[in-house]
């Protein structure tokens, strides 16, 4: 009986973990002696000035378990000549055969439409579904990038300023949508109020180190 109790009290292994590690970008040390763990189910905001290491840390997190991560980069990275539909669908390419993907590129297939259309509707992109993404606004392009991540249906979402190009109200709604669809979320955010509202844990980066790591509720007290 006591053995089972002891086993149940052991915390789960961290999803991500760094122990006294150095993270570099283009040969330059960005974060030094980094010790950090993130558990499954956490919603973490990375805050800090430009160049503090948020993007570098997200890249390192992604490299730890790439097959489990839906990734939303700071620059949407869309294919401009393709439609919103096709750019969202790109997140699901690995789930289908090459032949299926080629046919769907020429003419959207019903099965693919049934998956993409609800995502586009949630993102407010249903009217732009068959517009080429070079015709979209910056905010619409960013929402398309989020859609490409959502369609992957992975447990972890990593986002580098994923709502920087939309207004505060839209950003809040998009971040809620992201959190509803992923068990674990790590976001680089510049809006501290937004970070406190959406995330359960805040990590602050400055001068190559973690200078803040606290529950959101503690910082709002």
Task: Locate predicted features.
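H-loop/switch region of ABC-family ATPase nucleotide-binding domains
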Residues: 189-190
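Catalytic Walker B motif of ABC-type/P-loop ATPase nucleotide-binding domains
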Residues: 157-160
């Amino acid at each position: 009986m006591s053995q089972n109790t002891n086993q149940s009290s052991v915390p789960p292994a961290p999803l991500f973990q760094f122990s006294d590690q150095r993270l570099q970008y283009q040969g330059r040390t960005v974060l030094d002696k980094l010790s950090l763990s993130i558990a499954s189910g956490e919603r973490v905001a990375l805050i800090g000035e430009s160049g503090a290491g948020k993007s570098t840390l997200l890249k390192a997190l992604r490299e730890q378990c790439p097959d489990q991560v839906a990734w939303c980069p700071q620059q949407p990275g869309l294919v401009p000549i393709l439609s919103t539909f096709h750019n969202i669908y790109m997140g699901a390419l690995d789930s289908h055969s090459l032949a299926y993907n080629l046919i769907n590129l020429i003419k959207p297939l019903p099965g693919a439409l049934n998956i993409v259309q609800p995502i586009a509707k949630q993102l407010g992109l249903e009217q732009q579904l068959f517009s080429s993404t070079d015709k979209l606004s910056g905010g619409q392009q960013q929402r398309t990038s989020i859609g490409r991540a959502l369609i992957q249906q992975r447990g972890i979402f990593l986002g580098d300023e994923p709502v920087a190009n939309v207004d505060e109200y839209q950003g809040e709604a998009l971040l809620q949508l992201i959190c509803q669809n992923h068990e674990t979320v790590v976001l680089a955010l510049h809006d501290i109020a937004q970070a406190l509202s959406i995330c359960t844990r805040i990590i602050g980066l400055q001068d190559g180190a973690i200078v803040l790591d606290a529950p959101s509720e503690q910082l709002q007290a």
